[in-house]
Amino acid sequence: MNGEADCPTDLEMAAPKGQDRWSQEDMLTLLECMKNNLPSNDSSKFKTTESHMDWEKVAFKDFSGDMCKLKWVEISNEVRKFRTLTELILDAQEHVKNPYKGKKLKKHPDFPKKPLTPYFRFFMEKRAKYAKLHPEMSNLDLTKILSKKYKELPEKKKMKYIQDFQREKQEFERNLARFREDHPDLIQNAKKSDIPEKPKTPQQLWYTHEKKVYLKVRPDATTKEVKDSLGKQWSQLSDKKTLKWIHKALEQRKEYEEIMRDYIQKHPELNISEEGITKSTLTKAERQLKDKFDGRPTKPPPNSYSLYCAELMANMKDVPSTERMVLCSQQWKLLSQKEKDAYHKKCDQKKKDYEVELLRFLESLPEEEQQRVLGEEKMLNINKKQTTSPASKKPSQEGGKGGSEKPKRPVSAMFIFSEEKRRQLQEERPELSESELTRLLARMWNDLTEKKKAKYKAREAALKAQSERKPGGEREDRGKLPESPKRAEEIWQQSVIGDYLARFKNDRVKALKAMEMTWNNMEKKEKLMWIKKAAEDQKRYERELSEMRAPPAATNSSKKMKFQGEPKKPPMNGYQKFSQELLSNGELNHLPLKERMVEIGSRWQRISQSQKEHYKKLAEEQQRQYKVHLDLWVKSLSPQDRAAYKEYISNKRKNMTKLRGPNPKSSRTTLQSKSESEEDDDEEEEDDEEEEEEEEDDENGDSSEDGGDSSESSSEDESEDGDENDDDDDDEDDEDDDDEDEDNESEGSSSSSSSSGDSSDSGSN
């Protein structure tokens, strides 16, 4: 009702008990008379129209106007009243005809009484007794006490109430069935839709099952008690048990899809899309769990920096989450290029393994599931392109072409000064914010003498000239100022700051003071390692700065072009074949690249001459096969591609001749200086790295076959190179390709030239 039924009017209070003599026919007549006396344009509230009703005109038989009015008030209390009187009378007529229909079914005098639950039986039995013992208690307090007493009852006493309830419940069900037979017109069976029931989620299936089990043990439990008891159990289920319900839910969904498609064919008027039928009942976590048990591989980190962070964070559980990424970034910067390269190779290997495992996983899936997994992989790749991590941003920018991008303005002298001094100020004044730090640096710049400013202005001029000389296709942002060199104390602090922050509960000021005291009390012998690292960092800074001032090497003409389907160059001699075999089986992966090459040279010296001949024959056979495949591939090219390939080979030979000059050693030095300018390229491909190793193997192998000490030669060459094999892969590819072309003309020419190169190296040393 709308609330008015709870506040009886004076007429309702005065209703005589004799009103019971109204029959159904009399009440319908009353309503008909009222309907006939309504105004033609009845649009007012029913109370307004009711107050203007002439009840004497409504009176009929021996029912007076007042009696009719009282009866109307009684009937109108049974229906909602926020409508016009015309509408209200129609509803009242329906109520008079079927007073016990629908929700009012239980009000029928013959309707069987529902049995009390075991708890209510106990409550009704004990309430009077406890009310006498505790008259000061309210009904709420009594209910709480009796509820607690019932829970404390032994099972034997509880069983008495449970058995009485079950007996009366069976009797109630029999009486209800009899009532339905006797009064079929009163049962309002809502016409149920014949649309198939939607499939349940794994959690819903589990809850339905567990609820039945729970009610068998505690039949008197309320719905709230069942929910409270089972609510948290689903999240605590083991993966194996959760998987059981996931499989059941998937089976149910499959059945639903088949039934639903048949239903849609029979009812084409329904507007149900295919997406609505095939909608998954699994959550993201449940889907991932199923995929994991089906053998779907875990996606590896996207780049070497992410891989390093993932490994480092596993041991940083005590460090606050806000500090972890900062520490990871600092530790990453402390790694040498060789260590970063190792992580890059490891990351690339994980990606390759993932692709192989993913293909194997896809083969085991039906076509629909394959499409789903491929769709998820595609979305992940799209998201990666849209949001790049700080670690992956730099390589992607370096590897991209700059022709379509707007060139950046070179940095100013003041900016160079600020970047150089900012880190030192941050350590000395950690309480300053970024904006305060910037203002302080600006004041310091203004206070500098013109002589000191001239040094930074010279750098600015060099960077500006560099920017003007920079070609459109050159690698991105050579004019960026290199990172300032760190002092020994700064490098040490970055390596231990995590421990100090944990000790001082993330209080950075206290941690910095403690680190400063520890550093001052350290012996020189303990500081020596950090002093060496600082010296290396200073050399790195000076080298990068000199590279920025130097004009960029012209690499566009010698940049390796990729031709689809071009056969890969095989080893050119026995030593290179031997090296490739050792490198590919992973036996030496634990060694750094420099030591790895020395070890390969040493092993080559130890094997017998017959084994060397065996590797030489294998290499010669692969060279013959390569020539055949290369000829077939060149013939298969279109005329335009063939012409482009020949032009590329011709230009490459000319460029390599210019770069190498008469002395092979000087050419290698030239290439090395060029490669040093791009040593931070973290996104080089692993195949190019292998070719770089093969190039060194080739030189070492030739010298070994000529009787030279391969390991010694390799060590000397690498020590002269100076940067632990951080050669640019593209340049190494060019050397490989040049050797490859020359080898097509004469198999032994490359070997002899390499031998002469090594001999000259040895002579110069």
Curated annotation (Swiss-Prot):
The modification Phosphothreonine is found at T201. Residues 112-180, 196-264, 298-362, 407-475, 482-549, 568-634 bind DNA. One of its GO terms (cellular component) is nucleolus. It comes from the Eukaryota. Keywords: Acetylation, Activator, DNA-binding, Nucleus, Phosphoprotein, Repeat, Transcription, Transcription regulation. Residues 664-674 have a biased composition (Polar residues). Residues 1-21, 370-411, 456-487, 546-576, 649-765 are annotated as: Disordered. The modification N-acetylmethionine is found at M1. Residues 747-765 have a biased composition (Low complexity). Phosphorylated and activated by PIK3CA. Residues 677-746 have a biased composition (Acidic residues). One of its GO terms (biological process) is transcription initiation at RNA polymerase I promoter. Homodimer. Part of Pol I pre-initiation complex (PIC), in which Pol I core assembles with RRN3 and promoter-bound UTBF and SL1/TIF-IB complex. Interacts with TOP2A in the context of Pol I complex. Interacts with TBP. Interacts with TAF1A. Interacts with RASL11A. Binds to IRS1 and PIK3CA. Interacts with DHX33. Interacts with PHF6. Interacts with CEBPA (isoform 1 and isoform 4). Interacts with DDX11. Interacts with NOP53. Interacts with ALKBH2. This is Nucleolar transcription factor 1. The lineage of its organism: Eukaryota, Metazoa, Chordata, Craniata, Vertebrata.
